[in-house]
Amino acid sequence: MNAAVVRRTQEALGKVIRRPPLTEKLLNKPPFRYLHDIITEVIRITGFMKGLYTDAEMKSENVKDKDAKISFLQKAIDVVMMVSGEPLAAKPARIVAGHEPERTNELLQLIGKCCLSKLSSDEAVKRVLAGDKGDSRGRAQRTSKAQEPNNKSGKEEESRIHKEDKRSSEAKERSASAEHKQKEELKEDSKPREKERDKEKAKEADRDRHRDPDRDRNRDGEREKARARAKDRDRNNRDRDREAERDRERDRRSEGGKEKERVKDRDRDRDKGRDRERRKSKNGEHTRDPDREKSRDADKPEKKSSSSGEISRKLSDGSFKDVKAEMEADISVGASRSSTLKPSKRRSKHSLEGDSPSDAEVEAGPAGQDKPEVMENAEVPSELPSSLRRIPRPGSARPAPPRVKRQESTETLVVDRSGSGKTVSSVIIDSQNSDNEDDEQFVVEAAPQLSEIADIDMVPSGELEDEEKHGGLVKKILETKKDYEKLQQSLKPGEKERSLIFESAWKKEKDIVSKEIEKLRVSIQTLCKSALPLGKIMDYIQEDVDAMQNELQLWHSENRQHAEALSQEQSITDSAVEPLKAELSELEQQIRDQQDKICAVKANILKNEEKIQKMVHSINLSSRR
């Protein structure tokens, strides 16, 4: 709103009233209570609009209903329009709803002008109480004001015309009342009908007056309902999104936990199978006969078919335990066949775990077909690590091919081999999807395990002591696995039950903590909700404090004035009472003197009575004699 409008209101009303304070914030959007206080203060100080409201309406506690507020403001607007003769576009319903602050300020400015020019509002009050509206009067006076000059003679003519109109209207009213009395005497039966007509007219007038406010009220109500509906919709959407997010988070956590358990079980089974294979391979045959060397050429087709069939079985079943059982059966049949088939089986198994199923299907066949030929010729692939290339070769083996220096890591080999199925990976790579926790508990055997198996198959029993050349890594791996197996075997059923109890207790604690977190979240949300109204209240407190301080200063000054007046009156009273006090003391002294005299007279009387008695007694005695 424009600041000039507020300034004009402060200038117009500030000369008339001192309370309530005409602050810019209140005048920018004046509430009904504030307007009620202004109007009642104007009536109390200036007498303008006196008699317009009842004693109940003068108290703001009784004007709380919307209709009562509208009628209160409508009366004031009608009186101001009749007295000032200027039109007012302010609507009571809009003012009560908090709209149109500029028009509300215009109403306050007109009230201030009427009070400053000391215009009488008695006639307007009577007309408004009789049910007249201020529109026609305002229009008539507006047209007359536009036509009349602004000098004093024009005003005098207007007042004279107004007086003549008054007299003529009074004469007309008198004649009309006389006619009305005659009609009443003649037509007493038509009274009820006329009353009904008057009532209907009054109702129609009230309806016309309150039609616009009702429309505005309905519009405001519809707007509020639409806003409330939009807020509810947004709130419901937000709640739905939150619930969906929580469900997704829960599913993610449960899936993560299940995946971890699956990976742990898989690693445990794999390690147990490896230990079993290692023990059986160590206890098996370590020597080779020349017949076995010769029979390798004849067994080539069988090896190829058996290896391809075994790999297809592994892929179709998908269980690693069956693969390990087949490997154990092959070891028991013959050391030569087991030595040729184990690397291919191991490689196909790890390719299934580490890579995608499609890569495993592509690589399984070539790996199973090519590896026996490589082992038959006793050729070491160039892709094997340096530790595997340093294995001592038996005397019956053919000369090794020239060594090719490769500086590629096992990780790059995994990336390169994903493209085709012809290359054979000589390094067993464990699943990379396992978590760091599983890596800390279980040590994966890769290249050293393959080198150990090849060493056991190719080297005679007398050369098994060369395992020490691998370093302490294999020994540490075996020791940790043995310790883990001992721990697994040493676990008693009671301890397992205890671990289950601990898990259930941990879950309960987790549920309790999640509930407490939920409660904390709810309390934080309620705190944030209550923070906004608290901030608004703090904004209004400043205004209330200023008003209270001004009122306190006013009462302090009034108290001081009354105390001074009391002291002056006290001094005047004391000065007036002092001579009276002196007279009173004198009178009291005189009273005391008179009482003393009375006492003395009484004493004389008593003495005289005694004398008289004695004389009478003596006379009596003398007469007897």
Curated annotation (Swiss-Prot):
Tagged with keyword Protein transport: no
Region (Abolishes microtubules binding when missing) location: 1-322
Compositional bias of kind Basic and acidic residues: 153-327
A GO term for molecular function: tubulin binding
Region annotated DISC1-interaction domain, chain positions: 229-625
Annotated keywords: Cell projection, Cilium, Cilium biogenesis/degradation, Coiled coil, Cytoplasm, Cytoskeleton, Phosphoprotein
Coiled coil, from the record: 472-600
Chief location bin: cytoplasm
Recorded GO CC terms: axoneme; centrosome; ciliary basal body; ciliary base; ciliary tip; ciliary transition zone; cilium; cytosol
Compartments (UniProt record): Cytoplasm, Cytoskeleton; Cell projection, Cilium; Cytoplasm, Cytoskeleton, Cilium axoneme; Cytoplasm, Cytoskeleton, Cilium basal body
Region feature Disordered, mapped onto this chain: 130-439
Bias (Polar residues) ranges: 141-152, 420-434
Pfam family, one: MIP-T3_C
Changes seen on gene knockout: Homozygous mutant mice are not viable and have neural development defects, abnormal neural tube patterning, polydactyly, cardiac edema, and variable microphthalmia. Mutant cells have a marked reduction in the number of cilia.
Subunit description: Interacts with IL13RA1. Binds to microtubules, TRAF3 and DISC1. Component of the IFT complex B, at least composed of IFT20, IFT22, IFT25, IFT27, IFT46, IFT52, TRAF3IP1/IFT54, IFT57, IFT74, IFT80, IFT81, and IFT88. Interacts with IFT88. Interacts with MAP4.
Chain's role: Plays an inhibitory role on IL13 signaling by binding to IL13RA1. Involved in suppression of IL13-induced STAT6 phosphorylation, transcriptional activity and DNA-binding. Recruits TRAF3 and DISC1 to the microtubules. Involved in epithelial morphogenesis and in the regulation of microtubule cytoskeleton organization. Is a negative regulator of microtubule stability, acting through the control of MAP4 levels. Involved in ciliogenesis.
Name of the protein: TRAF3-interacting protein 1
Organism per entry: Mus musculus
